Amino acid sequence: MSHLAELVAQAKAAVESAQDVAALDSVRVEFLGKKGHLTLQMTSLRNLPAEERPAAGAVINQAKQEVQEALNARKAALESVALNARLAEETIDVSLPGRRMENGGLHPVTRTIERIESFFSELGFAVATGPEIEDDYHNFDALNIPAHHPARADHDTFWFDATRLLRTQTSGVQIRTMQQQQPPIRIIAPGRVYRNDYDQTHTPMFHQMEGLIVDKDISFTNLKGTLHDFLRNFFEQDLQIRFRPSYFPFTEPSAEVDVMGKNGKWLEVLGCGMVHPNVLRNVGIDPQVYSGFAFGMGMERLTMLRYGVTDLRAFFENDLRFLKQFK
């Protein structure tokens, strides 16, 4: 057994002198491996009387356990040293700035809507909204649009059934507002509208904004002044503007507004007019006492003119190369 004690001492000394995990594993194999010094001690048990073998085996196992514990402790120490060394090499400078997050941006049509809302809110206009699934009364009848009008045709309007449709204009919001509120009324109504059309300058869904004023003594002069101020504010230049006579069932007189483009050609930007007396009567407002004006414009159309976009469909394709230009 004195030889066993020497082996344990040698093993512990070898363990302490190991400088890395690989060297430590070599010590383990040398003393505890299949042919290790301590493992081979078990073969000497056959030379002992049967009654002495259990006690001798226990002593050998105890020696192996001591060496194994020494191996485990040394391995933990070496791994800790290695970890600390690696962490020291991987030190993070917390004073460095973090990774830059790419900022998003508003869609160009959203920019246009917010810009227009901001302008008209300064003039006392409130923002009004309404349902996109509309009935034929609010979308057509109340607006003085007769049954034979082309806008009611299936090829222009998305109908659900005989009376329900996807609104073709936000004018229904004006009707609902006038039904629920007595003059004076001053609103703008932005929102999505739907028409059965798709090409370079038309999409089945687009954004429209309409404006409405109803009060006493409202004249066409008020309409012209308001739209002159708006267009010059929106395009940020002293534009040449003209009002061209037109026809809309819900206004009388009616006009379309053009601005002079950089190429010397007139560009249509919106439609407008004085609210038709029939429309006022349909919502219970006396046209002998009150008058008003209304205007409507496509948000995509104005956005195209402001930013020089040539294809309306680009606004709906979610191409980041296009959208990032407006950040």
From Swiss-Prot:
Sites where the protein binds Mg(2+): 252
Record's cofactor remark: Binds 2 magnesium ions per tetramer.
Keywords, ordered alphabetically: Aminoacyl-tRNA synthetase, ATP-binding, Cytoplasm, Ligase, Magnesium, Metal-binding, Nucleotide-binding, Protein biosynthesis
Keyword match Nucleotide-binding: yes
Gene Ontology molecular function: any one: ATP binding
Catalytic activity: tRNA(Phe) + L-phenylalanine + ATP = L-phenylalanyl-tRNA(Phe) + AMP + diphosphate + H(+)
Subcellular location as annotated: Cytoplasm
Record field: transmembrane: none
Pfam families: Phe_tRNA-synt_N (PF02912), tRNA-synt_2d (PF01409)
PANTHER family in alphabetical order: PHENYLALANINE--TRNA LIGASE, MITOCHONDRIAL, PHENYLALANYL-TRNA SYNTHETASE
Subunit structure: Tetramer of two alpha and two beta subunits.
Protein name, as recorded: Phenylalanine--tRNA ligase alpha subunit
Organism, as annotated: Edwardsiella ictaluri (strain 93-146)
Gene that this polypeptide is encoded by: pheS
